[in-house]
Amino acid sequence: WVLLPASQFLCRGCVSNGSPRARGVARQFADAPVTIVGLHTVFEHHDVMGPEALAVFLQEYRVTFPVAVERPGRSGGTTPQTMRAYRMRGTPTVVLIDAVGRLRQQVFGIYDDLHLGRDLGSLVAEATLSVAAVQGP
C-alpha cells in the first residue's frame, strides 16, 4: 500500500502535523509492505518554494522518504495537476492507496493518530491476508 502525504513547507499544519506524522509512519511501519512518497504541492507562493528551498526543508526536518514535486496547473491554472486529479482541497492532505491501487482514504487537514493507525492497520492486515491467500497452506 501507499501513503501519500501532500504538503508544502509554508503550511503550518503540514510542518506541525503532516510531516512529523509521515516520518512517524515511516519509522513505525519500516517492516510493513508500505511505500511512502511525499508530494510537495505548491498552489501559492511559488517564488519562494523552489527546489533549493525544498531541499533545505527536507534536510532540516529529517525527511528520509522520497518527495515528488508537483507539476504546475495546466493552462496557467494555480491548482497543481495531482492536486486537481485527486480533488484535494488544500494541504496537508493524506492519501492512502491499497495494494491493488485503489484509493482507500483521503483526509484533508489533521489525520489524527488514532484514525491513521486504524486505517494503516487495516491495510497492513489486508496485505498480509492477501499474501497468505496467494501462498496457500
Model-derived regions, located:
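Alpha/beta-hydrolase fold active-site loops
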Residues: W1-V2, V34, P92
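Aromatic-flanked redox-active Cys/Sec active sites in thiol-based oxidoreductases
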Residues: L4-C11, T41
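Conserved Rossmann-like nucleotide-binding pocket used by diverse enzymes
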Residues: S7, V37, A68, R84
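Thiol/disulfide oxidoreductase modules built on the thioredoxin-like
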Residues: N17, Y61-V63, E70-G121
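Non-globular targeting/processing and membrane-anchoring segments
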Residues: R118-P137
